[in-house]
Amino acid sequence: MHEKFTFTLKSTSGGARLGEVAMPRGVIRTPAFMPVGTVGTVKAMYLDQVRELGADIILGNTYHLMLRPGPERVARLGGLHELIRWPHPILTDSGGFQVMSLSGLRKLDEKGVTFKSHVDGSLHHMSPERSIEIQGMLDSDIQMQLDECIALPAERKEIERAMEMSLRWAERCRVAFGEQPGKAMFGIVQGGDQPDLRIRSAEGLKELDLKGYAVGGLAVGEPQDVMLGMLDITLPVLPTEKPRYLMGVGTPDDILKSVARGIDMFDCVMPTRSGRHGLAFTRRGRVNIRNARHAEDMRPLDEQSNCPASRDYSRAYLHHLTRSNEALGGMLLSWHNLAYYQELMQGIRTSIEEGRFADFYAETIEMWARGDIDPV
């Protein structure tokens, strides 16, 4: 067992990095995809399944867990790991993004943000210190600073104000977090689509000497080339010996291109959310299983996959389930999508280790471009 939180950069291939984050509850192989367990569940999945697919860590959402069942109750029940039966690492976000996007009647100032719950309209206050306190009660292994995430496009003045506020909040979160052996607090780079603000944010966070650094405020409405451009500007500023986490991203294409730039960790609801709506991600691109072409196709989504949902169930059956709005359809497609994401990450890690990431990148893009197999 690892007593401390450590990050080891094991190998590189071009800009892509192979590493390992170690902590008492386990080791995270990077680049890593973290399935999102918003309210203590990866939607439509058993956590045993999530683990079997290759996930080393999952994500929990501070905003949702704060509203129900509540952090004090989670703490009384032994913490989030005990409650949900997941003994491996958990990362919790700060709740900031959901406060800004879901809650009503927000009042934001230097102290924090006051907001109404989207569940029952109750009034709550989230400060940097309270966010860290809640994450401590949840007993997560990696905790995120409270930040203000601005949706793009936005005026530069507003982006700059939010970035500077987030920097000050990062320092307060660092003080509130203190020293917790075996755990880590990450800062979040903000600055919207403004290169100089991104650099200022990264430099300011670097001075705090945190255990890891996230890039936030992307995949919030901007084109992919803008997101990648911000990574090109931001990542050279961040220390190479610390893990880098791109928040809320994304599609397999986003992940592959971000790995090429040096990102180590990802999370996104896309594989499970898309699965619940009949969309499958495969080695030959996206497949909308609701389309009529699949109605009498007895072939599986991917006969090469180790996942039963991908290998053993016909497209015709998956089509029937999704068109009938049966819960099993969303369950099987979520299972398939998470399997594909983890297979992609394993392929990325192996290719970096073998020094052939550029070839893997080109081969993967080429396979996606071919499109789905021909109809029957």
From Swiss-Prot:
Pathway: tRNA modification; tRNA-queuosine biosynthesis. It catalyses: 7-aminomethyl-7-carbaguanine + guanosine(34) in tRNA = 7-aminomethyl-7-carbaguanosine(34) in tRNA + guanine. Residues 248-254, 272-276 are annotated as: RNA binding. Its EC number is 2.4.2.29. Pfam families: TGT. One of its GO terms (molecular function) is tRNA-guanosine(34) queuine transglycosylase activity. It is an enzyme of class 2 (transferase). The active site is at D93, D267. One of its GO terms (cellular component) is cytosol. GO terms for biological process: queuosine biosynthetic process; tRNA wobble guanine modification; tRNA-guanine transglycosylation. Keywords: Glycosyltransferase, Queuosine biosynthesis, Transferase, tRNA processing. The keyword Transferase applies. Substrate binds at D93, S94, G95, G96, F97, D147, Q190, G217. Homodimer. Within each dimer, one monomer is responsible for RNA recognition and catalysis, while the other monomer binds to the replacement base PreQ1. Catalyzes the base-exchange of a guanine (G) residue with the queuine precursor 7-aminomethyl-7-deazaguanine (PreQ1) at position 34 (anticodon wobble position) in tRNAs with GU(N) anticodons (tRNA-Asp, -Asn, -His and -Tyr). Catalysis occurs through a double-displacement mechanism. The nucleophile active site attacks the C1' of nucleotide 34 to detach the guanine base from the RNA, forming a covalent enzyme-RNA intermediate. The proton acceptor active site deprotonates the incoming PreQ1, allowing a nucleophilic attack on the C1' of the ribose to form the product. Belongs to the queuine tRNA-ribosyltransferase family. This is Queuine tRNA-ribosyltransferase.
